Design a protein with these regions (language model features):
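Glycine/small-residue-rich interface belts in oligomeric ring/scaffold proteins
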Residues: 29-85
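Structured loops at beta-to-helix junctions and adjacent beta-edge loops in soluble globular domains
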Residues: 61, 70, 101, 155-158
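A residue-level signal for conserved active-site and pocket-lining positions in enzyme catalytic cores
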Residues: 98, 155, 196
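Amphipathic alpha-helical segments
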Residues: 27-41, 108-115, 188-200
Length: 231
């Protein structure tokens, strides 16, 4: 599992950015387009049972990008993330969501509830890699609205060491790539900053901007000694 050295000081339960989700209509086409335009090579992920979605993983070391597509419209419509992916595709948004990683989701949940946050139940998930390895996790949604949100969800991985998606072997055009910043837009930027302060503390890994709609606006990566922006 990637370390938590990027976690802000003072957070009782460390959290860091884990991954960013990019909605695509077709996984193969989306992966080819990402590689052609940005030089980032994706690897097969797997289907999310009961969620109606499947993914391709773009490893970034401590983090990763997740190309996510709807493979069963009925199942996807029953899940909050599936609905957001469908909405993002309809609106032609390049980014749909982002996630934070923690080692103790129950502690994070208790801290947020103690601050008065009304949270839905924790959800367990899994997928099977092409090699048969099963990856399991638990997630905590924060924003329960149906549309893409600027607020990330939180994930706790329940996997053996070395199996985090970001740690997979990558063959990007310019060598290893790393996520440097997630830029989100919010109609109520002050409220969004306050929430992210509770979730992530003071961190250079995110930036909040005033916007007409809520959501992830762009991400900044570094590869081959150069900055790479996806927006």
């Amino acid at each position: 599992m990637p370390d938590f050295t990027q976690s802000a000081k003072g957070l009782k339960t460390p959290t860091v950015v884990d991954h960013v989700l990019l909605p695509v209509a077709d996984l193969d086409d989306g992966a080819r387009s990402l590689e052609k335009r940005y030089g980032l090579k994706g690897i097969p992920g797997g289907r999310h049972p009961g969620a109606g979605t499947a993914n391709v993983i773009v490893p970034l070391g401590r983090q990763y990008l997740e190309l996510i597509a709807i493979v069963d419209e009925r199942e996807a419509a029953s899940r909050r993330l599936g609905g957001r992916v469908a909405q993002a595709l309809k609106e032609k948004r390049p980014l749909v969501a982002w996630a934070l990683r923690t080692q103790d989701l129950d502690a994070v949940r208790a801290r947020l509830q103690g601050a008065g946050w009304d949270l839905p139940a924790i959800v367990e998930g899994s997928r099977t890699r092409p090699d048969g390895q099963v990856l399991r996790w638990r997630t905590q949604d924060i924003d329960t609205g149906p549309e893409p949100s600027a607020i990330p969800f939180v994930i706790e991985w329940r996997i053996p060491e070395g199996l985090h998606p970001g740690e997979a072997h990558s063959t990007h055009r310019k060598g290893p790539a790393a996520l440097r910043r997630v830029v989100v837009g919010a109609r109520d930027a002050r409220f969004c900053r306050d929430r992210l302060q509770m979730l992530l503390g003071d961190s250079d890994l995110y930036e909040v901007r005033d916007a007409a709609v809520d959501g992830v606006e762009k991400i900044v990566l570094e590869t081959g000694g150069s900055e790479l922006v996806i927006e």
